[in-house]
Every structure is written in structure tokens, then in C-alpha cells.
Amino acid sequence: MLFVSTTRHANPKTSSLLRSLWVPAALVALIGAAVRVGMLATVAAAQDDKLWGLLNKWDAKHYVEIARGGYFGADISTDGPVHETTMAFFPGFPFLVRAISSILGTGEAGTAIALNVLFSIALAAGVMALAAQMGMGKWAQVLSAVVVTSAPMSIVFSMPYTEALFGALAIWAVVALVGERWWAAAAYIFVAGLVRLTAVDLVAVFGLMVLLRARKNWRAWAAVAFSIVPLVGYLWWSSSHLKE
């Protein structure tokens, strides 16, 4: 997390990073979100539908209901016990939404969408940081962020979905791995393991990177082991309930 001093003696490196990375990333993410939501609003109007309803369709309903009622109290229509459906969704995102909405007194759906705006900015910034590591110039970095945040179905970045959060965690994990900052990578992947099952791919890449670049570094292997804890823990916990 980047904190920027607002005093007259702000760190020049921090101020430079803000201008070169986070401001362009915010512009890319916010303009992209405005375009996507604007296009969806046009479609909604043409079909006599409601934009808010479209933004909360599909799995978005499940995430919002888990945020409201938890795995066992979600108001979701199912053929069996509700947790047999809700436990397909990892807890990181809905419970973060629940915590923030409780603190701010805001609705879960709106909170989720607002959080995803911030996560989209972090995703765009991560793409730019990775492009910079690869030696790309400023405009190539910005274009890379545009391509990633405007991929097909990127409207989910503006819905109560996990793609923006997971994408941000994944890209910053890769940035850390390329820089051989093993414990920073472990922290990102640890959190990603609370968000989506696909965090297993990040763990696999982490292990491969350590094998290739730091195979004799026990601290790096400890970081790999640490990163997988929430993923394994949630699968064990949910499986224990689904066996009942």
C-alpha cells in the first residue's frame, strides 16, 4: 500500500512514483470503467432494463448475499442447503465487503462496486509496474494497462465480482516474484488464496520461480509454504461442511 505525504517535505521518490504510476493507472481504470458502464447503460436503456440490475447479475448476487448473510444465511434460491452453493465462493471478497459496509453503513452491492474501482486502479498500476520491469517506456506501460483492464468481459471489474481484486493481487505478486522479493510475493498470494481457487496457479508459479532462482534459500521455500495456507485452509473447512 502506498502512502503519500501531504507535507511540504514529501519524499521526492514517492511523489515521482505517484505521478508516474498511480495517477496514470487511476485515469486508465476510471476512464475504462466509465466507458464500460456507459455502454452497459445504453444497452439497458435499449432493452428497457435497469443498469443497477445488470451490474448485480450472475455471481454478483451470490457475493452480495454472502456479504449480507454469510455462507449459511445467504438469501439464494437453491435445490438443497444454501451452503452447498455459497461455499463455491471464497470468503475474502464478500467478507471484506461486509466489513467495509458495516463500518461505513453502506449497502453491500454499492460497497463491492466501489471497492472494485480501487482494485481496478491497483490492477492497472501493477500492469504498468510489470511493464516497467520489462523495460517498456511510459506509453507502452499505459497501453499495457489499457489492454488488461479492457479485456473481454472487463465489465466484471465494475460489478460485485472478484476479478479486480484477484487480478490486482496476482499482478503485484508477479511484480514481486520478478524482483525476487519472496515474502512480498507470499503476502499477495496468501491474500489471493482467500479470494479465488485459481490462487493455486500463483502458488505453482511461486514454487517454480524459487526452484529456478533460489532453490537453496530456505526462507524463500518458507514463503511458498506460507502462501498456500489460506487456500488449503478454506478448502479443508468447506469440505468438512459439505460432507455433512
Residue ranges and their predicted role:
Residues 46-47, 57-83, 92, 243:
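Extracytosolic helix-loop segments that constitute the early lumenal/periplasmic catalytic or substrate-binding loops
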Residues 1-46, 132, 219, 223:
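Start-transfer (signal-anchor) and selected internal transmembrane alpha helices
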Residues 97, 101, 124-128, 132, ...:
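Hydrophobic transmembrane alpha-helices
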Residues 158-165:
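Short acidic/glycine- and proline-prone juxtamembrane loop motifs at membrane-interface regions
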Residues 81-82, 91, 95, 103-125:
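Loop-to-helix entry region of an early transmembrane alpha helix in multi-pass inner-membrane enzymes
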Residues 31-50, 55, 199, 203-244:
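Membrane-lumen/periplasm interface segments of specific transmembrane helices
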Residues 149, 170-175, 183-210, 225-231:
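Membrane-interface alpha helices of multi-pass inner-membrane proteins
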Residues 107-110, 127-150, 168:
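Transmembrane-helix signature of polytopic, membrane-embedded enzymes
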